[in-house]
Amino acid sequence: ERLMAEGARHYGTLRGRALQWLERVEIDAGRIDDKPALYSGGMQQRLQIARNLVTSPRLVFMDEPTGGLDVSVQARLLDLLRHLVLDMDLAVILVTHDLAVARLLSHRLMVMYRGEVVETGLTDQVLDDPHHAYTQLLVSSILQG
């Protein structure tokens, strides 16, 4: 749908782009005609990533992109996301409660508490030397957990 919204109408072109993106997100091209409901959770996430990136946006919003996935699936998906972000030079706004995901995917971090921004800065600086009490609690609870 997204390619058609941008004016693509030729079936061969649409299918070709879809095949390219299935390959980029590591889904077997032979499954191009499968309904999304037939995919596993991790494959559905990768399919959604392809759907959102097919039009080459400059900015992407991700809300808990690895939520609900097994740890092994999360690792593969995070690796894929990291490579796509670098390859496409994407700006990403990422919402996550997982500090490992934040550390892996972000350059800058904003910590919110009760709807207010309490700390911002380079990811490593904020996580390695938190100044706000909530950020300190957040980081220490992850280290102890």
Residue ranges and their predicted role:
Residues A75-M88, A100:
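Helical segment within the ABC ATPase nucleotide-binding domain
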Residues T13-G30, V139-S140:
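Conserved ABC ATPase "signature" region
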Residues E26, L127-G145:
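C-terminal boundary and immediately downstream tail of ABC-type ATPase nucleotide-binding domains
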